[in-house]
Amino acid sequence: RCTTIEVENSQTKFSAAIIARNKDFDLAALKLSGKPLANLNLFSEAPFALQNVIVAGYPFGDKVSTGVKFNLGIISSLAGPLNDPTLYQIDAAVQPGNSGGPVVNETGSLVGVMRAKLDETIIRRAFGVAPENMNFAINMKTLLKFLEENKILYELDKEEIRDRKTVSETLDKATFMVNCYY
């Protein structure tokens, strides 16, 4: 368990506290000591297979560079491993450090939260090949259930049309690297 949590991005740094968590889904809600420069709206419609998505995060933390990184992909399947209905399969390239980061549609509305990628060692042993871009995000239904169960307020998308530059700028302000100190 963390004794201190800090979140930071290229513009701000805050202390944070866990206000809700779900170990089954590897989800946590953090209360920040200040107000972020931007928030993400939650997508109000059901995402669909082949929908374009953008994953934002800090792959390998600050070891590569300190800024947020973006990867493009699609929703490959509306189910996770073994037909898990709480996950989407996406093909955007992800690494350690993307977990917990936003998965948004082309207009920057949240459609999921990055969770995991297939374990390369296990898949290679089972099938003789390495998996390529078989990654999984917590879907909106699961995220909304988590928020509602924990009485966390949220805002559904107003379906604004945003260009990719605006989406990039918003994600840069709204995505944080989480640092846990013991």
Predicted regions and their residues:
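Conserved active-site neighborhood of the chymotrypsin/trypsin-like protease fold
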Residues: 1-65, 83-87, 149-159
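Short edge beta-strand segments in beta-sheet-rich domains
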Residues: 2, 68-70, 85, 129-135
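C-terminal cap/linker of serine protease catalytic domains
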Residues: 15-16, 37-39, 59-63, 110-182
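Terminal peptide-recognition signature
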Residues: 16, 28-30, 50, 55, ...
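Soluble non-cytosolic domains of exported or imported proteins
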Residues: 44-48, 69, 94, 98, ...
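Short, compositionally biased
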Residues: 67-79, 126-129
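A contiguous binding-surface segment within folded domains or other stable secondary-structure elements
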Residues: 76-80, 85, 103
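Catalytic nucleophile loop of clan PA
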Residues: 93-117
